[in-house]
Amino acid sequence: MDPVVRKPDPGGVQHRVTKALRAIVGHACRHPIHTLLVTALTAATTHLHVLEGTYQATHRGLAPWAKETPLNVQSFLWGSRTVSLGEASAWKWQIDDRPKVPEDGQSDFHWALVTLDLPGASVDASIPFLSNTLSGFLGAEQTTPTPDSSPSPDHSALTFRVPYSQLDGFLQAVEIIPSEKEDDSWRLRSPREEGSPRSLGHWLGSSWLSFLHRVHHAETVDLVIIGLSYLAMNMTVVSLFRVMRHLGSRFWLAASVLLSGAFAFVLGLGITTTCDVPVDMLLLFEGIPYLVLTVGFEKPIQLTRAVLCVSEELWGGGQRQVPNGASSDDSRQNQLIPNIIQLAVDREGWYIVRSYLLEIGALALGAVLRPKDSLGHFCFLAAWTLLIDAVLLFTFYATILCVKLEITRIRSPGGLGQVNAKHPSGIFGHKVKSTNITWWKLLTVGGFVLCHFLQLSPFFYRVMGEYMANGTLPPTAVSPFKEAANGLNEIYLTARVEGFETRVTVLPPLQYVLESAGFNISATKRSTFDGVLDGLESPLGRLCLMGALVVSLVLNNHLIHAARWHAWPQARESAVPDGSYLSVPCSATAPEVCTRPPEETEALLKSNQAESLTDDELVELCLRGKIAGYSLEKTLERIAAGSSRSVTRLEAFTRAVRIRRAAVSKTPSTQNLCSGLAESLLPYRDYNYELVHGACCENVVGYLPLPLGVAGPMVIDGQALFIPMATTEGVLVASASRGCKAINAGGGATTMLKGDGMTRGPCLRFPSAQRAAEAQRWVESPLGHEVLAAAFNATSRFARLQTLTVAQAGIYLYIRFRTTTGDAMGMNMISKGVEKALEAMAAEGGFPDMHTVTLSGNFCSDKKSAAINWIGGRGKSVIAEATIPAETVRQVLKTDVDALVELNTAKNLVGSAMAGSLGGFNAHASNLVQAVFLATGQDPAQNVESSSCITTMKNIDGNLHIAVSMPSMEVGTIGGGTILEAQGAMLDLLGVRGAHSTEPGANARRLARIVAAAVLAGELSTCAALAAGHLVNAHMQHNRSAGATVKK
């Protein structure tokens, strides 16, 4: 396999996008630590910005540098709730979601309940003064405050009911309230300035109560849908971990994907709040699962898979290979970690960006179409989140992949030692000088000092405080009956007596601070530092710091452990044996030294502690019979499942193949012939043995690469196709292509399906020939056919019994079941149905003395030439025909029509009859059938009956008419070898892979038609070469090879 990765040939836009992505990824991967730190710090700063605006106080109105700003009356209505009372509600309070602006003539019956929260020990003495000062102002009336409405014992509350139309004037009037003492006054605090370092707990408690309230009043269907959405989201996350585990990472890559997504969401939320786009927390709670389900984690998985594929191609599964014609320096440059990431981006970057653009475009369209709805706001947030996620994928996550590959390279044998010997200062593909390290240390220390200086600087908070205060999330709505129960009760009594419908808007309590001669008393109770420091003092801030500390410790430990991997070679040899999954396979012919006695290795194997067993020790266990050769895959899979290292099932199977090769090479009875198998040119790496295990082959020691060509294109039933052919016979594909060209000149080939039914013929034994004859009569009767068909059809959705053919030989009875099998070739399907049908025959037909000699009595007849298949057909019965113009026969086939007709009669008809041929009235149909069978994963043995073919030619109006009739074509598009990746790709080439979505069996029938058309092309070209006398010359020119050489 050529390890050189070739770049695609993209179009203009794709080329420019890929080039830009290469530059971005290359820069990020060559400075991984910088990229990780900048991303983490940016996300942390944005996270604190969101917390600052949402939960905590910036107190910009209380700071000595604050500017006087006009009162934003509308902001005090955030979180308010309106209730109504009247005859329509049977004089009971109910939540009223209508607009708060009343209709004309009803303003007197729309009240606002305002609670003033006044701090300070002297407030009790000032309450009479305040009541007299504020009562009657703009129609305000004092009501009895609700008990426990104050947040702390040293706070007092005053409640007023104000006509809603006078609310603006009332709030402006109470912005500053004088105290009974001349030096004291209360100043109104903006809703955005509420809170303290303890407000996060209050916010969480309020959010929990609000959540319970919404759950209590929500519809059951809504709760079920939301629950299912979160369940599906969690399943998506679990699927991410499973896929990453399959790719070789148990935890860290999947966790990095989730961390990158969390960073993207935090940054997107920060941008959204900065743009003054309100974010509805309820819609956010409901919408995030659908965003995760819609977008998923396919793009990070796609990039990860591409990176691993490129690294595998360049490093050759642990052995660095130098491609032919490339110098060692070029190879070394191609194998640098950043270059690997860039090559992966060349392959998949454009497709990932295209997917991102489509998703972002759809979300942006939703934001534009619904700019004032919560759905539009969520689309705005989701679009920004996806855009930032795309940026982080090619920077932050690409850097994580770079670190992962670097650790893998360091831990691989010879990785760090060889690199250090030639490039002692190369890290992440970037040459690092000692002076650069010194500068990096100085910058780190200087940045640390600068951060602390900014934390203590008022200028920092003056700038950042004004910026952070703009991004807030809407608060939780107030509970009217909890905050203003007494006021609502008084209004209720008045409205009930007067009989007027009344609406009341309950505002959240207005927070005040007590100032004395310009000194903020409340401010002295706060922490010394505002801004970011408050965020760090909050419980969530502490949790984030602890999480960052844990991640830092784990990452440093991982990197230090990787660096130590090669520091102590002897310790590494004991910790990572030669048989580990990252090691280079051992040589079977090299002298081996067993480090442990056989008894110890056997004990480890029996006690399920075989993780430390090396390849050589496992080979010795195989040779001593402690591990059966056929069960190596199961044994290695069990060892991998209990391993502490991340070992995939595919890696376990590949290791099993490697060990089996070594065991076969060392088997004493065959060592004189098989000793070179382990180091032979038979390949075994880079193959998906998971598909082979339990399905296609046992005792696997590798795979055979078979040359694959395509003939055509050929027009078959109006559709042009390339026909894949796997063969080692020269001229075959070229000859078929010439036949395709000639057939296309006449309009292409036409095919017909004459029959579709697979057969199985069991052999039954009876006590006497008379009982066998009675059984035959019962099977051929309508009752017998009905019983057998019912039992047979119940075994499969696709198997449907068509006909029963019965033959008797003495006491033996042969029944040939013919049935449809869908898109499968169907031998297993029909065997299961025959077994059940015979059970029904013995039980319901009255033949308990019947004995099944064999399920296949050669009356099928399977994998052998038989007249019953030639006459009655088996599998698909297909005919393909074409008409070739006389001019094409002369120009392309280099012969004439009459010569071809005569040759076909003399050779294919008379000659085959003289030889007593059975189904062999053709030139070389088996050649074409077998080549297509091997290419598409069909059963090679069934080439025997599938190649039964008669070729006919006739001169019609001077043109050549040619046809092939093949009564027993046995093919399928599911099961067997069609599950292998390469063979499945060839079925994709023909458009017939898998089961047909709407018409069962259509893909298999189409494949049979294609094989018959390929035989038609091969027959035409070969007969023409024979007629023109070119066959020998063609084979001498194209089918001659030099003697085989053995690579040393």
From Swiss-Prot:
SUPFAM superfamilies: NAD-binding domain of HMG-CoA reductase, Substrate-binding domain of HMG-CoA reductase. The chain crosses the membrane at residues 33-53, 221-241, 251-271, 277-297, 349-369, 378-398, 440-460, 543-563. Glycans are attached at residues 470, 520. CoA binds at residues 735-741, 892-894, 1034-1035. Signal peptide: none annotated. Residues 222-403 form the SSD domain. The active site is at residues 729, 863, 939, 1035. InterPro entries: HMG-CoA_N_dom, HMG_CoA_Rdtase, HMG_CoA_Rdtase_cat_sf, HMG_CoA_Rdtase_CS, HMG_CoA_Rdtase_eu_arc, HMG_CoA_Rdtase_N, HMG_CoA_Rdtase_NAD(P)-bd_sf, HMG_CoA_Rdtase_sub-bd_dom_sf. It holds the Pfam family HMG-CoA_red. Residues 54-220, 272-276, 370-377, 461-542 are lumenal. Keywords: Endoplasmic reticulum, Glycoprotein, Lipid biosynthesis, Lipid metabolism, Membrane, NADP, Oxidoreductase, Steroid biosynthesis, Steroid metabolism, Sterol biosynthesis, Sterol metabolism, Transmembrane, Transmembrane helix. Pathway: Metabolic intermediate biosynthesis; (R)-mevalonate biosynthesis; (R)-mevalonate from acetyl-CoA: step 3/3. The keyword NADP applies. Residues 1-32, 242-250, 298-348, 399-439, 564-1048 are cytoplasmic. NADP(+) binds at residues 796-798, 823-831, 1039-1040. Its EC number is 1.1.1.34. It is an enzyme of class 1 (oxidoreductase). One of its GO terms (molecular function) is hydroxymethylglutaryl-CoA reductase (NADPH) activity. It catalyses: (R)-mevalonate + 2 NADP(+) + CoA = (3S)-3-hydroxy-3-methylglutaryl-CoA + 2 NADPH + 2 H(+). One of its GO terms (cellular component) is endoplasmic reticulum membrane. PANTHER family: 3-HYDROXY-3-METHYLGLUTARYL-COENZYME A REDUCTASE. Belongs to the HMG-CoA reductase family. This is 3-hydroxy-3-methylglutaryl-coenzyme A reductase.
